[in-house]
Amino acid sequence: MTKRTLGGTNLKKARTSGFRARMKTAAGRNVLKNRRRKGRHKLISV
């Protein structure tokens, strides 16, 4: 029997902590601003 893949988890992650989710709220935009200011290569950790 084949194992089931972890389908859908990436979509869930993206919906909660993706770029567009961050841009939606003022707090999320602050997160992005701080990560840009710190010089993070990746703004989103998904």
Curated annotation (Swiss-Prot):
Keywords: Chloroplast, Plastid, Ribonucleoprotein, Ribosomal protein. The keyword Transcription regulation does not apply. It comes from the Eukaryota. GO terms for cellular component: chloroplast; ribonucleoprotein complex; ribosome. The keyword Plastid applies. This is Large ribosomal subunit protein bL34c. GO terms for molecular function: structural constituent of ribosome. Its main location: plastid. The gene is rpl34. It is found in: Plastid, Chloroplast. Belongs to the bacterial ribosomal protein bL34 family. The lineage of its organism: Eukaryota, Cryptophyceae, Pyrenomonadales, Geminigeraceae, Guillardia.
